[in-house]
UniProtKB/Swiss-Prot annotation:
Known EC number: 1.6.5.-, 1.7.1.17
Requisite cofactors: FMN
Protein's gene: azoR
Amino acids binding FMN: S10, S16, Q17, S18, M96, Y97, N98, F99, S140, R141, G142, G143
Enzyme class (EC, first level): oxidoreductase
GO molecular function: electron transfer activity; FMN binding; oxidoreductase activity, acting on NAD(P)H as acceptor; oxidoreductase activity, acting on NAD(P)H, quinone or similar compound as acceptor
Domain of life of the source: Bacteria
Name this polypeptide is given: FMN-dependent NADH:quinone oxidoreductase
Protein source organism: Pectobacterium atrosepticum (strain SCRI 1043 / ATCC BAA-672) (Erwinia carotovora subsp. atroseptica)
Length: 201
């Protein structure tokens, strides 16, 4: 039995294309793997605090007394990392906002990227400590950017997730939603087809 973690990050709730694709994936996965468990974390509905000068002090080893706000941030970071490590399949719904990931997802990344916990530095270089997992990124865009210099999202996510140890990584692109209903419909259909294939892979 596998455990699946689905991370949503769109600010558009039910109107979000990436959220709808994530919901489709969840439904397909439950149908194909009825014994598996699925956890959905909506980073827009349950926002993660922005990492600032005070909070970053909570995430670094120190003997200093933590403020109540730092204590909350450290506990949240510990909980998020434990949740991440406890799952076998990580699904990230990451729409493109202004050529990058949503702030909500970046805030999550900032709390789960911790030296000595999710990665470490060795004589051979950095080593990710989030290992043995499969990761799937669902990314929706108004324009068409895949394979072009304007797609900053895919290379960033490959570097960041790989840095944590998530190297078994697949992308599903749903592009062109700003080009009209016909293009949008085909983008959704193609993405759903690919997702259905990944569910049974």
């Amino acid at each position: 039995m596998s455990k699946v973690l689905v991370l949503k990050s769109s600010i558009l709730a039910g109107y979000s294309q990436s959220n709808q694709l994530a919901d489709h994936f969840t439904t397909q996965w439950q149908s194909a793997h009825p014994d598996d468990s699925i956890t959905v974390r909506d980073l827009a509905a349950q926002p993660i605090p922005v990492l600032d000068g005070e909070l970053v002090g909570a995430l670094r080893p120190s003997d200093a007394t933590l403020t109540p706000r730092q204590q909350e941030a450290l506990k949240l970071s510990d909980d998020l990392i434990a949740e991440l490590q406890a799952h076998d399949v990580i699904v990230i719904a990451a729409p493109m906002y202004n050529f990058n990931i949503p702030t909500q997802l970046k805030n999550y990344f900032d709390l789960v990227a911790r030296a000595g916990v999710t990665f470490r530095y060795t004589e051979q270089g950095p080593e990710g400590l989030v290992k043995g997992k499969r990761a799937i990124v669902l990314t929706s865009r108004g324009g068409i950017h895949k394979g072009t210099p304007t797609d900053l999202l895919e290379p960033y996510l490959r570097v960041f997730l790989g840095f944590l140890g998530l190297t078994d990584l697949e992308f599903v692109f749903a592009e062109g939603y700003g080009y009209g209903p016909d293009v949008a419909q085909k983008a959704t259909e193609d993405a759903k087809t690919q997702l259905s294939q990944l569910v049974t892979a």
